[in-house]
């Protein structure tokens, strides 16, 4: 494909030690030759690929020196975009990088759209669409675990699994077309049995990938963990203790937290989305009532609940009412304020929690917090919450395409078992291929491709 030459600032626009202005396209070398004065006189267009050159960026019209720089020259096809790429490594900050970018645009480059460098890598065949999405996941990764999964996707783990399934489907199509062209009754019966078995295998393969979508959501968005309890049991104090900073207001006045507070914390590599909720109780105060309603909505969506109880007080009607709405949830009972004289009835608590997980903590004295973090980690990796370290995870877009592909493959299985003609069976197989192609990009629409790359930042 032939594209124009694009340019953008690829680094953070604020104050920094280094800034990078990136160019990609057929005119990248010509443009840099006009504005770059190497320390040792040389034709920058003729230097070896993947080399670094010291010099200055100079306005060719005014001869004003813009900055002292290092210029990276990377020639096609062995580059990120499979086009000629130039990266100008200059001093950081808004002024210098903006002036250099302006000069580059003046020489004929166009300002890149969000994600356009990676989009060109996809359109030029260097990566598939799932790998392009992995670039976004790497940029947005909140923990090393999230980064590790994204890196697996970037090197093609998802694409390779999809290719395996597509190859199997293509094999089935070849067999079916052969049966259509050369029908022999004895051979046909044997072939249809083999085709049926392979079709069922593909359904199982798709199911395995679909099952990993929940892990993918947790890794990308964080384990939704709601901190709940009646007012003034220490929910906000627990949030602050886990964050190791004062994010929520802590007072002795019940009902202080009116809004839902969301923060991310890294618990042993797992991204945890902590949600501090308003204390759940009956109230006539309008604003607090809205907060309680929001808290109940959060409960319905949470992957894990930290139910905070006050060890220095007896269980109350409010505690029991909260217990009643927690059926079917992953719960850790957090017994707070153990630094104070204990008044809670432990036998009553154990009966109520049905031998659930109880962790004793003091957010004031920082007791039990590490045990709580270990418990969350163990819940995740022993399988109580859907996440395994060894699986390939997919995103919601992949899941939708896989669900559709599975539907067509199941229809294919039914058609084979029902003795339908080979022509009808191939329709379902081709439809399944089309859905799988949406994941890696071969059959993705232009609108879908644009939508994905619009999520990128400019310069990537």
Swiss-Prot record:
Query: Which residue windows are transmembrane per the record?
Result: none
What's the superkingdom here?
Bacteria
Question: Which is a GO BP term held by this UniProt record?
Answer: tRNA methylation
Q: Which residues form the signal peptide?
A: none
Keywords, in A-Z order = Cytoplasm, GTP-binding, Hydrolase, Magnesium, Metal-binding, Nucleotide-binding, Potassium, tRNA processing
What region holds the TrmE-type G domain? 222-381
Give the GO cellular component terms, alphabetically: cytosol
Q: Where does GTP bind?
A: 232-237, 251-257, 276-279
So where does Mg(2+) get bound?
236, 257
Task: Write out the residues that bind (6S)-5-formyl-5,6,7,8-tetrahydrofolate.
Answer: 22, 87, 126, 460
- Note the subunit structure: Homodimer. Heterotetramer of two MnmE and two MnmG subunits.
Q: What name has this protein been given in UniProt? A: tRNA modification GTPase MnmE
Per the UniProt entry, what species is this protein from, by scientific name? Answer: Thermoanaerobacter pseudethanolicus (strain ATCC 33223 / 39E)
């Amino acid at each position: 494909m032939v594209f124009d030459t694009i340019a953008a600032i690829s680094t953070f626009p604020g104050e920094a030690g280094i800034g990078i202005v990136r160019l990609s396209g057929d005119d990248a070398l010509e443009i840099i030759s006009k504005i770059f004065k190497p320390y040792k006189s040389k034709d920058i267009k003729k230097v070896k690929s993947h080399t670094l050159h010291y010099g200055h960026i100079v306005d060719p019209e005014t001869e004003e020196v813009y900055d002292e720089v290092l210029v990276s020259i990377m020639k096609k096809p062995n580059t990120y975009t499979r086009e000629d790429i130039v990266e100008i490594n200059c001093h950081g900050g808004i002024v210098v990088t903006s002036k250099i970018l302006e000069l580059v645009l003046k020489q004929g480059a166009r300002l890149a759209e969000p994600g356009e460098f990676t989009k060109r890598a996809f359109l030029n065949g260097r990566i598939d669409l799932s790998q392009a999405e992995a670039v976004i996941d790497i940029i947005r990764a909140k923990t090393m675990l999230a980064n590790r999964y994204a890196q697996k996707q970037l090197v093609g783990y998802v694409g390779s699994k999809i290719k395996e399934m597509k190859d199997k489907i293509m094999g089935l199509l070849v067999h079916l077309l052969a049966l259509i062209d050369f029908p022999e009754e004895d051979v046909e019966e044997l072939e249809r049995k083999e085709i049926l078995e392979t079709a069922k295998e593909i359904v199982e393969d798709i199911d395995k990938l679909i099952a990993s979508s929940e892990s993918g959501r947790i890794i990308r968005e964080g384990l939704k963990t709601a901190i709940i309890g009646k007012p003034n049991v220490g929910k906000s104090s627990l949030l602050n203790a886990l964050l190791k900073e004062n994010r929520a207001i802590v007072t002795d006045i019940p009902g202080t937290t009116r809004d839902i507070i969301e923060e991310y914390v890294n618990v042993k590599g797992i991204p945890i989305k902590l949600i501090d909720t308003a204390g759940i109780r009956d109230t006539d105060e309008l604003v607090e009532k809205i907060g309680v309603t929001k808290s109940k909505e959060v409960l319905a969506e949470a992957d894990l609940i930290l139910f905070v109880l006050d060890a220095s007080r007896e269980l109350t009607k409010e505690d029991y009412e909260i217990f009643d709405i927690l059926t079917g949830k992953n719960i850790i009972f957090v017994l707070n304020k153990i630094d104070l004289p204990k008044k809670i009835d432990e036998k009553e608590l154990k009966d109520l929690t049905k031998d659930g997980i109880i962790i004793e903590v003091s957010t004031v004295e920082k007791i039990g917090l590490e045990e709580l973090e270990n418990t969350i980690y163990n819940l995740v990796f022993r399988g109580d919450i859907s996440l395994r370290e060894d699986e390939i995870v997919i995103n919601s877009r992949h899941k939708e395409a896989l669900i559709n592909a599975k539907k067509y493959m199941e229809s294919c299985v039914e058609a084979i078992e029902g003795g339908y003609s080979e022509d009808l069976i191939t329709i379902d197989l081709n439809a399944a291929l089309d859905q799988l192609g949406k994941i890696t990009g071969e059959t993705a629409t232009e609108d879908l491709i644009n939508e994905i790359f619009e999520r990128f930042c400019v310069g990537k």
